[in-house]
């Protein structure tokens, strides 16, 4: 995980920061103006300062307008307010253009790909840790605060370096190291009864509006937000014209989605719009969609060498439909208030363009699969599943034709929908002033439109007087194997892989009871049955059935698979959770690190007394009923005994 605990001084960043005596502090790229990312950060910082100045002027003018009753003064103040509001609007539009700038985040390769949406880092002001920490050390711990000046200076240098992290693993390590130090500080110096009295000042990443709080959770949340934002910048600059680049980009966007989800689930009372629950949920969906897009781009690379293979084209059609579905969800989330009020309009338009573009690509690849090969006997059912709805509640479409002429007609219908979709994407592209400057986006959509038109011309005949058929929707599906589930397969649990274990049906059943979904749990084992003889135990999780991974299978899928087994039996592979290690014995507390892992976790103890205004805090979730507690299967209505 990117939020793991790291000792101070482990790993190095770039050496452009100010020099240190012992070299233990990792560094960012130092000056704001040494390179292109630094220039962008410097421009954002200047815009944030100007926005903050205009906001203060507007607040003062509004107070004067309410306080005076002089008509001439009120008219003059109203005129000045109109100027201030105009300046604020221009500054926010300029900041939005910076947020959608693709010049800095161009992929490193030469391939032409659709640009991604990177997220800018949150800016902050310099913070004086020395004075409040020295006072607290002297008053509470009874030690000389001046004897810790070196350590406090290292902390200040580390925070200063996190303002300009390098866009690589060193930058991520830098932010994670500072986050770990904040966890240590939270456990040692912050409590409901005492606090160093620091004021943390951060600017909103989307609007540039300043926010400040005295809660350390605000500082921790802002650093975690920057970890996710830095992952988006790393993913956006990958070269998606090669397999390695698409894999790195997909991984970076998935990690960004994980950071935003962790922040959303544990963060409350956000003082800035970019850290609100609605914004974080939208950002999580956006990163998932961009990761899915990278997966699709990776599949295009090997498939381009063999375009006449029908299974590859069908897979590409479903993957493109999956990307279109994800971007459709993102576009709806961006269009909902209050997100649409402060989100750059170009982001919403780009998500809409991508939804139309990838939906058109899905129909294009479906047409390629229909017209370039005749399906085998076993392949027809698979093609039917691609074009038919996956749920029984939706009406079934027409049966997939087998005759070449009928397949050509259906392919033309899909190409027609592809052409209409690409034309709609180009129309949406021209409506946005910011997107019109992105030449790569127009080039990619135009190339896709030309491919569809060329293929449609090949299928067009002079004697085509038949009634045009309506092409069915492509069922979205991704063939990417997910990792996890995290409820079991994470660093919180220790487990052991058992098997494969072969069992045969004895006296009508395999001798165990199943419960739960993803993964399915063995809730009970019949004494003396086949499962007990094979070594299966209560609490084991089934991860493989006859060599097929089933960690993400639903309960019904596993039961159906087991019931279909004949006299040959079944081969299962399970994982057994191991007991957690006993807590370490109580001993002298170290000065730098803490014994208890909870002390450097994500929670901040909430005060017992009520406050007049809610402050930003980390919520504690109720973790009961999770892994490790197995209720009696006889009282669980979801239990099913495998026959």
Curated annotation (Swiss-Prot):
Residues 1-43 are annotated as: Disordered. Residues 15-25 have a biased composition (Basic and acidic residues). It holds the Pfam family HR1. GO terms for biological process: focal adhesion assembly; glomerular filtration; kidney development; negative regulation of stress fiber assembly; plasma membrane bounded cell projection morphogenesis; renal albumin absorption; signal transduction. The keyword Phosphoprotein applies. It comes from the Eukaryota. This is Rhophilin-1. It comes from Mus musculus (Mouse). The gene is Rhpn1.
């Amino acid at each position: 995980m990117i939020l793991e605990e790291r000792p101070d001084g482990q790993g190095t960043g770039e050496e452009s920061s100010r020099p240190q005596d012992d070299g233990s502090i990792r560094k960012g790229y130092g000056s704001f103006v040494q390179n292109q990312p630094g220039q962008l950060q410097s421009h954002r910082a200047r815009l944030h300062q100007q926005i903050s100045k205009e906001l203060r002027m507007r607040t003062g003018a509004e107070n004067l307008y309410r306080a005076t009753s002089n008509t001439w003064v009120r008219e003059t103040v109203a005129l000045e307010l109109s100027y201030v509001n105009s300046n604020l609007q221009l500054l926010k539009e300029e900041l939005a253009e910076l947020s959608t700038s693709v010049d800095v985040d161009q992929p490193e390769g030469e391939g032409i790909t659709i640009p991604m949406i990177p997220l800018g880092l949150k800016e902050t002001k310099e913070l004086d840790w020395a004075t409040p920490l020295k006072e607290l050390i002297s008053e509470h711990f009874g030690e000389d605060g001046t004897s810790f000046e070196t350590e406090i200076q290292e902390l200040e240098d580390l925070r200063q370096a996190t303002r300009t992290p390098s866009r690589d693993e060193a930058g991520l390590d830098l932010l994670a190291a500072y986050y770990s130090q904040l966890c240590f500080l939270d456990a040692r110096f912050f409590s409901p009864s005492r606090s160093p009295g620091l004021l943390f000042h951060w600017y909103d990443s989307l609007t540039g509006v300043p926010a400040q709080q005295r809660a350390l959770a605000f500082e921790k949340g802002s650093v975690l937000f920057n970890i996710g934002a830095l992952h988006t910048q790393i993913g956006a600059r990958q070269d998606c014209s090669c397999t390695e680049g698409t894999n790195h980009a997909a991984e970076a966007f998935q990690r960004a989605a994980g950071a935003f989800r962790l922040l959303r689930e544990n963060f409350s009372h956000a003082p800035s719009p970019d850290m609100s629950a609605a914004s974080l949920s939208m950002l999580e969906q956006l990163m998932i969609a961009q990761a899915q897009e990278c997966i699709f781009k990776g599949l295009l690379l090997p498939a381009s060498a063999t375009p006449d293979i029908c299974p590859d084209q069908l897979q590409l059609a479903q993957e493109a439909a999956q990307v279109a579905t994800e971007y459709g969800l993102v576009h709806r989330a961006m269009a909902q208030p209050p997100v649409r009020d402060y989100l750059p309009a170009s982001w919403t338009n780009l998500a809409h363009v991508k939804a139309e573009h990838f939906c058109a690509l899905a129909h294009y690849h479906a047409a390629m699969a229909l017209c370039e090969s005749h399906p085998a006997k076993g392949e027809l059912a698979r093609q039917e599943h691609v074009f038919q709805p996956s749920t029984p509640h939706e009406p079934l479409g027409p049966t997939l034709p087998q005759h070449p002429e009928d397949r050509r007609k259906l392919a033309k219908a899909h190409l027609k929908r592809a052409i209409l979709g690409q034309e709609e994407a180009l129309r949406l592209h021209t409506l946005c002033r910011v997107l019109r400057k992105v030449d790569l986006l127009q080039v990619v959509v135009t190339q896709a439109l030309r491919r569809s038109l060329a293929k449609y011309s090949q299928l067009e005949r002079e004697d085509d007087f038949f009634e045009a058929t309506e092409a069915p929707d492509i069922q979205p599906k991704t063939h990417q194997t997910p990792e996890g589930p995290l409820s079991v397969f994470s660093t919180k649990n220790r487990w052991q892989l058992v098997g494969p274990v072969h069992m045969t049906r004895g006296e009508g059943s395999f001798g165990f009871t199943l419960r739960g979904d993803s993964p399915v749990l063995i809730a009970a084992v019949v004494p003396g049955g086949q499962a007990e003889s094979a070594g299966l135990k209560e609490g084991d999780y089934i991860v493989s059935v006859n060599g097929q991974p089933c960690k993400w299978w639903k309960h019904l899928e596993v039961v159906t698979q087991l019931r279909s087994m004949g006299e040959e039996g079944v081969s299962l592979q399970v994982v057994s959770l191991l007991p957690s290690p006993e807590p370490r014995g109580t001993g002298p507390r170290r000065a730098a690190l803490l014994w208890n892992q909870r002390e450097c976790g994500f929670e901040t103890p909430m005060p017992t007394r009520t406050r007049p205004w809610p402050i930003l805090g980390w919520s504690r979730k109720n973790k009961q009923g999770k892994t490790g507690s197995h209720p009696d299967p006889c009282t669980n209505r979801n239990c099913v005994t495998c026959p």
